[in-house]
Design a protein with these regions (language model features):
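Active-site machinery of serine-nucleophile hydrolases
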Residues: 85-88, 92-155
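Alpha/beta-hydrolase fold nucleophile elbow
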Residues: 163-177
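Short glycine-enriched nucleophile-adjacent loop
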Residues: 180-191
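C-terminal catalytic histidine-bearing segment of alpha/beta-hydrolase fold enzymes
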Residues: 226-241, 245-305
Length: 305
């Protein structure tokens, strides 16, 4: 069991530096709960593999602008109930995005609130505004274990909860687009795959199918894969379903708009084909919130006896 270590918004986001833009997010979400925007030693970046930046299609993305952001956003909703174990939903953004952009564009905080779930949202910075899926330190062995330890330590040091003795509960790993790669690495060698209760791929199954299947076979967590016709994930999604069918592993394949709450709650492997474009799959129909509602996370308000 892991415990803590001892030791106008659109204009602001468009013009501010990464640290300044992130800092201005905190008061913007105060009505919903407590947002902390901080920096982690264990955050994906900086990383030696991107010390000289990254070249994509002959264009160089320098390290200073794209691979030096160690920002991690942590949001605790009003009314969070302390139980001694904290459930986390950790979302990894895709290409050409940032922490501030992800919170704004996909309304993750608003969707968490709408779900009514007793969970903490965490959004670490990946490659900032770059065409890159590299997960930095979170791709290293035990990288996720170190990240969660620093996360718990931060919550403890900031006095977020009244009780000091708390540990990691269930963890949902969510990723849009290029966010798939860091999730696959976490499941494969992050050190705490057993804590990953669910994996959500928002038009993100581009590769690493073996790692996702290995996690599912070993830990029997819920895998939700929503895919589009033109986002580049259809072939891999259909190939994964074919593998499951060949080995007689049950799964649900349904149109995203027709999936019922009961279907989402009772199936372990779920493939949702959608008519939405790539960048709309997280927020347009509030799927992030719907996935949360059908998760095993506790509600903010306990059910009436």
């Amino acid at each position: 069991m892991l415990r803590p270590m001892t030791a106008p918004l659109a204009i602001l986001l468009a013009t501010a530096t990464p640290a300044l833009a992130a800092g201005n997010l905190e008061p913007a979400y105060a009505a919903h709960g407590r947002l902390m925007v901080t920096q982690f030693v264990s955050a994906p970046f900086p990383h030696p593999a991107r010390a000289t930046g990254h070249k994509y299609k002959a264009k160089l993305y320098p390290a200073k602008e794209h691979y030096s952001d160690s920002t991690v956003a942590i949001f605790i909703p009003h009314g969070f109930r302390e139980t001694g174990r904290v459930d986390f939903v950790i979302h990894f953004h895709g290409w050409h995005n940032s922490v501030a952009g992800t919170l704004r564009d996909y309304q993750l905080i608003e969707q968490l609130i709408a779900s009514g779930k007793n969970a903490v949202l965490v959004v670490p910075a990946g490659p900032r505004d770059a065409p890159d899926s590299f997960g930095g330190k979170l791709e290293e062995r035990d990288g996720f274990k170190h990240f969660l330890a620093e996360l718990l330590a931060t919550l403890q040091q900031r006095g977020v909860f009244q009780r000091k003795d708390f540990s990691v509960g269930r963890v949902i790993l969510s990723g849009h687009s290029g966010g798939y790669r860091v999730i696959a690495a976490i499941l494969d060698r992050g050190g705490l795959a057993k804590n990953a209760d669910e994996v959500w791929l928002f038009d993100a199954l581009y590769a690493e199918t073996d790692k996702f299947l290995a996690w599912s076979d070993r830990h029997h967590g819920r895998l939700l894969n929503i895919y589009t016709d033109h986002g580049g994930t259809k072939d891999d999604s259909e190939a994964m379903m074919a593998r499951l069918k060949k080995r007689a592993t049950p799964f649900l394949a349904v149109e995203e708009a027709k999936a019922t709450t009961d279907e989402l709650k009772t199936n372990q492997l779920i493939f949702l084909h959608t008519d939405l474009p790539h960048n709309d799959v997280v927020e347009k129909r509030q799927e992030f919130s719907r996935f949360l509602k059908t998760s095993r996370f506790d509600d903010l308000k306990p059910a009436a006896p």
